[in-house]
């Protein structure tokens, strides 16, 4: 009888241990922070991945690209997200090698609130730059009316709305303006946070969209999905080939196809003001940032699996949320790149 009692005791002990093991399996939380630009699709991805893997909860704070880079560098989050690639100085200062993984593409659009003007305005890069620098101050300035014949624009003062936080959306916007206007590059420059000559600041894409929506005579810049969600007017922008192009899945994808032909190994590439017919000039990849050799191998393995899913099955969610999916050539390169992450 002793062997039977012993076996029963072992079995009973194993059963008692199951809930504890199960609880541990249910408590894998991975924290990330960064860009607001991709928040709508990241939120969708993390939710759907949790449905596939209930034991995993990915928590993401959309605090802006600058904040995401800082928190990743300080190792207070497991992954970061940015719309502007890290600088070489930031990468060098980080405690370990970091890999940039493009996730989707989007377009940054000039949004405006002009009472009684409900048409799509045309902008050149130079005109946008002069507005942002405070050199064009009225909506009926000849530089604007000359691009928009037949549109009656008022003599209303222009209020510039910009980001108050470190922002990849800002990086994309000023990167384009710096290519279109050498004077803007010299005066304002390219960074996730710049010294704005004029205007008022809002936090996140949501904050800028809210400012523009509530401020008659205003202009700002947000990711396309935020303009659509908030029902704010946005304009077309002249590309390098001289066309005035409206942001859309097709025009952003056209920009990506140009980049796909010469993608650098580290994936840090700018596609603003790309050449080509039908290309929207203020387009960009957005990136998730991961350490190549993290100390937490369990979370690393989960994030590698998540990235493989996001780069393949997850891409189908992009169009409905206003993003362009990655070109197949870029996905193939990334699936090879994630193998560098140690799990």
What are these model-predicted stretches?
Residues 7-19:
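Bacterial N-terminal signal peptides
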Residues 24-343:
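Flexible loop/hinge segments at secondary-structure junctions
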Residues 1-5:
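Positively charged n-region of N-terminal signal peptides that target proteins for export
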């Amino acid at each position: 009888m002793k062997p039977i009692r012993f076996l029963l005791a072992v079995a009973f002990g194993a059963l008692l241990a199951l809930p504890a093991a199960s609880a541990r399996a249910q408590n894998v939380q991975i924290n990330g922070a960064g860009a607001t630009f991709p928040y709508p699709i990241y939120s969708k991805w993390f939710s759907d991945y949790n449905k596939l893997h209930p034991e995993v909860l990915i928590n993401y704070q959309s605090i802006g690209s600058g904040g995401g880079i800082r928190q990743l560098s300080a190792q207070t989050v497991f992954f970061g997200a940015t719309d502007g690639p890290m600088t070489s100085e930031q990468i060098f200062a980080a405690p370990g090698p970091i890999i940039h993984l493009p996730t989707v593409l989007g377009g940054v659009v000039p949004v405006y609130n002009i009472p009684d003007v409900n048409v799509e305005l045309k902008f050149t890069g130079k005109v946008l730059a002069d507005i942002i620098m405070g050199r064009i101050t009225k909506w009926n300035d000849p530089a604007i009316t000359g691009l928009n014949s037949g549109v009656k624009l008022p003599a209303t003062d222009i209020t510039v709305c910009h980001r108050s936080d470190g922002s990849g959306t800002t990086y994309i916007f000023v990167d384009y303006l710096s290519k279109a206007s050498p004077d803007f590059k010299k005066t304002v420059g390219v960074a996730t946070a710049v010294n704005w000559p004029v205007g008022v600041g809002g936090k996140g894409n949501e904050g800028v969209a809210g400012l523009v929506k509530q401020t008659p005579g205003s202009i700002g810049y947000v990711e396309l999905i935020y303009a659509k969600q908030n029902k704010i007017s946005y304009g077309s922008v002249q590309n390098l080939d001289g066309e005035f192009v409206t942001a859309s899945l097709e025009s952003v994808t056209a920009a990506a196809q140009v980049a796909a032909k010469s993608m650098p190994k580290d994936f840090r590439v700018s596609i603003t003001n790309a050449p080509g017919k039908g290309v929207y000039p203020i387009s960009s990849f957005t990136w998730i940032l991961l350490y190549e050799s993290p100390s937490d191998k369990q979370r690393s393995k989960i994030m590698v699996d998540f990235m493989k899913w996001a780069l393949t099955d997850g891409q189908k969610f992009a169009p409905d949320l206003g993003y362009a999916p990655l070109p197949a050539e870029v996905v193939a390169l990334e699936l090879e790149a994630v193998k560098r992450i140690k799990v």
